[in-house]
Amino acid sequence: MYSSVMAQTLKLSHSPKALASLAEQFKALGDETRLGLMMAVAASEDAEACVCDLTPDTGLAQSTVSHHLKLLVDSGLLNRTQRGKWAYYSLTASAKKLLK
């Protein structure tokens, strides 16, 4: 009975595409490094950060941090803006809702 009610609720409130997107966001946030990067971006000055600012605190290689940031961008949690040599990251509207 519970699964039937749950299935009806999901059908009424969210499309399969919306559920897949939400699942992808939770999957991305399920990694401690990515969650930490999201929190660091949120706490940074002007609510945006460059990979060059985020790398030193992680203890990871810049390429690894960039990989994690790309996954967060692909999942719709971060925006990426290129400025010259560096990419800057900021939270999307959906990420701001999740972190409230």
Label the predicted regions.
Residues 1-29, 74-77, 91, 97-99:
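N-terminal leader segment of winged-helix/HTH proteins
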Residues 20, 24-61, 83, 87-94:
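N-terminal helix-turn-helix DNA-binding core of bacterial DNA-binding proteins
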Residues 43, 99-100:
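Short, charge- and proline-biased low-complexity linear segments
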Residues 56, 67, 73-74:
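Alpha-helical residues within the helix-turn-helix
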Residues 61, 66-68:
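Short coil turns linking two alpha-helices in DNA-binding domains
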Residues 68, 76, 84:
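Conserved phosphate-binding and hydrolysis motifs of nucleotide-dependent enzymes
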